[in-house]
Amino acid sequence: MNYPGGIKIKNINKEINYKNRGMTLENDINKTNEYYKEIEKAYIYKKPTPIKIVKVDYPSREKAIIKEAYFTIPSTTDYNGLYKGKYIDFEAKETISKTSFSLSNIHKHQIKHLDNIDKNGGISFIIVRFTTLNKTYFILAKDFIEYVNNATRKSIPIDFFEKKAYILNDTYRPPIDYLKVVDYIIGGNNGKEN
């Protein structure tokens, strides 16, 4: 198309970038946790991934660049912290599938860690976002683990989440108010409420 004044508009074809897949849920949770901290409601933090730095290009302190690093030990879960005197520990996962959540998305050591937290009186759960469906679920670790221990397939169908998990609706601030579900659980309610 020719615009007045000879202005040419570039046709920008957006490339699909897979390196940050799963980051939208993480960003929403990070913003939510910042909000909780600002209003002094809870103190929940993203755990750093444990790495061993092997090689550094060190021209100056301000310009140091890590050239080579390795994961030292398997990371446990994404987030942990305190809320109303309770220890909270959880994992956040995204999937583009419309029908199921692949068990390959979560590692055995993470499941064991969540189970240990639950057995020791903490609150452990997994937040799973089905990005294509724009649905985010809060599933208690014990329900997730029970399914995994009895699984005959390598994925969890979405109908399991619809029956056993709590739906987390998107809100402006905080983006994902998962502590509403934690309040419901702490309150001693065993039933599912959406």
Which stretches of residues belong to each language-model region?
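Acidic-basic catalytic patches of nuclease active cores, encompassing PD-(D/E)XK
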Residues: 8-67
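Conserved catalytic cores of phosphodiester-cleaving nucleases, focusing on short active-site segments
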Residues: 77-98
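Short, solvent-exposed loop/turn segments at secondary-structure junctions
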Residues: 53-54, 97-100, 134
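Mg2+/Mn2+-dependent nuclease catalytic core
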Residues: 93-120
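A short catalytic or substrate-binding loop motif that flags glycine-/basic-rich loops and adjacent residues
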Residues: 70-74
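Nucleic-acid nuclease catalytic cores
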Residues: 115-145
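Short, electropositive alpha-helical surface patch
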Residues: 139-162
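Charged phosphate-binding loop/patch that engages nucleotide di/tri-phosphates or the phosphate backbone
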Residues: 2-12, 16, 162-194
